[in-house]
């Protein structure tokens, strides 16, 4: 008896009628790669927090916000690689939870802030119906996540400070940092990874001309 190829029933219906594959459905490899990115950046977040509260403490606020974009990279990076609804939200939220588990100085507040920042990026990709994964979209997603993060900080962490001398400049600097580090940085990282071939199972890897 001849065995049918593995996965055949995922592609055909009874009678041989082709069944369309849902492009928005997450594959196992999507979950795995998004989780790997999240765990890796959860550790990076912890180290970045040491930098923020250590050597970088010499840079007064709002200037120190130039470093903020690193905390938003997983949202843009995860979305650019996985290219599925929820990728930005899943990757950054999980990265935030990992950093909480490791022992970040901001503790459980990140359980709320992480998903909010992730939603900022997710909304941008959703606005383009999850079909645009180019440089402008990545820059917008990074900036949106940065604005959400900075507004949260301004309201929760710095409520007593002046809007003109502290909070508005802080929001602006954070947005620019997110645009450059999370937006442009993620694009460059995906390009570098694609050239190695490690992303060949993803659209981001098969299209060498990504973004």
Regions found by a protein language model. Give the residues of each.
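Alpha-helical membrane segments and adjacent membrane-interface helices in multi-pass membrane proteins
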Residues: 62-121
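Short helix-perturbing small/polar motifs within transmembrane alpha-helices
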Residues: 34-38, 112-157, 187
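Membrane interface segments of multi-pass transport proteins and intramembrane proteases
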Residues: 53-61, 129-133, 195-198
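Membrane interfacial helix motifs at helix-loop boundaries and amphipathic/re-entrant anchors
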Residues: 43-67, 100-111, 150-173
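Hydrophobic transmembrane alpha-helices
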Residues: 6, 16, 20-78
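Membrane-water interface at the C-terminal end of transmembrane alpha helices
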Residues: 127-131, 180-197
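Short, highly charged, low-complexity non-transmembrane loops/tails of multi-pass membrane proteins
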Residues: 193-211
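Hydrophobic alpha-helical transmembrane segments
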Residues: 31-36, 69, 73, 85-93, ...
């Amino acid at each position: 008896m001849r065995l049918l190829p593995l996965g055949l029933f995922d592609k055909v219906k009874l009678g041989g009628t082709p069944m369309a594959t849902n492009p928005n459905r997450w594959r196992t490899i999507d979950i795995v790669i998004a989780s790997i990115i999240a765990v890796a950046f959860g550790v990076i977040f912890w180290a970045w927090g040491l930098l923020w509260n250590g050597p970088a403490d010499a840079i007064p606020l709002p200037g120190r916000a130039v470093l903020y974009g690193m905390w938003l990279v997983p949202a843009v990076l995860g979305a650019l690689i996985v290219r599925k609804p929820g990728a930005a939200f899943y990757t950054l939220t999980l990265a935030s939870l990992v950093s909480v588990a490791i022992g970040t100085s901001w503790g459980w507040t990140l359980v709320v802030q992480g998903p909010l920042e992730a939603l900022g990026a997710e909304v941008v990709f959703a606005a383009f119906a999850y079909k645009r994964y180019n440089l402008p979209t990545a820059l917008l997603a990074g900036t949106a996540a940065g604005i959400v993060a900075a507004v949260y900080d301004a309201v929760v962490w710095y409520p007593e400070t002046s809007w003109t001398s502290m909070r508005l400049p802080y929001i602006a600097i954070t947005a620019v940092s997110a645009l450059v580090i999370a937006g442009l940085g993620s694009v460059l990282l995906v390009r570098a990874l694609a050239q190695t071939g490690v992303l060949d199972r993803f659209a981001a890897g098969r299209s060498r001309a990504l973004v």
